[in-house]
């Protein structure tokens, strides 16, 4: 089972069940996974799901919320041979009008009630209803990419109006939801791992939340280790390059004027550098007659580098200066 399917299975068992929350959830299910029909003034509707737990959750909402017993059909998905489509049908009935009234999906004209299949603010006035709406919306048209690969939560909307309504609900929880047009649909999405964790918390997918947090921790540790290794590698390369440069300069000095012509303090460190090519600056410093720290050793080696540079310019005969520290 994918991460997204697992999260949906969990949320399906935790739908908020107060009267107002049921209406918000049913409205989302019908809007994003359903169709409403009208024939001879009588309404009927159905909703289809690929997830059995989601279909069962919607079935129970209709039963508990409106005392309606729905018909259920199960068919093999023609697009995905291994999957089934679960369709929950509420047959034509005069009672269905009352349901649509409570969901704010109809409006009255002088002659009759006509379908107004758009989401209304009245459905999500309370914070609990907003949560129920997000639960049902996620179950109907949401998906989460495998967090091992990337952090991405999205909702596939048919209209810009629906996308903006969902975006507004998400922003009421301080989510930075964005909208992008994809072919003929509108996608509302979150890309930050922390925001997806917060969203899972709001809709009650706590097991999925913990799994995602564990993945985030492992990925962060892995990234930290990689950064540390890269940093250590860069420092090691820098140290090796500096050591090779020092050795090359000392050998050049030996061939030109001879190491013996260097001041005693530079002569001592030069010989140690040649003899212990793999030693660190700290180790070289500890081998001196009068031990020095890394900065002191580095200072003397820089002086040697400068002498070699002057000699390479040519025409300048190096004169042995007086000993200095």
Swiss-Prot record:
Top-level taxon of the source organism: Bacteria
Pfam families: HTH_WhiA, LAGLIDADG_WhiA, WhiA_N
Gene Ontology MF terms: DNA binding
A biological-process GO annotation: regulation of sporulation
InterPro entries: Homing_endonucl, Sporu_reg_WhiA_N_dom, Sporulation_regulator_WhiA, Sporulation_regulator_WhiA_C, WhiA_LAGLIDADG_dom
SUPFAM superfamilies: Homing endonucleases
Annotated function: Involved in cell division and chromosome segregation.
Similarity comment: family membership: Belongs to the WhiA family.
Cross-referenced NCBIfam families: DNA_bind_WhiA
PANTHER family on file: CELL DIVISION PROTEIN WHIA-RELATED
Designated name of the protein: Probable cell division protein WhiA
Native species: Caldicellulosiruptor saccharolyticus (strain ATCC 43494 / DSM 8903 / Tp8T 6331)
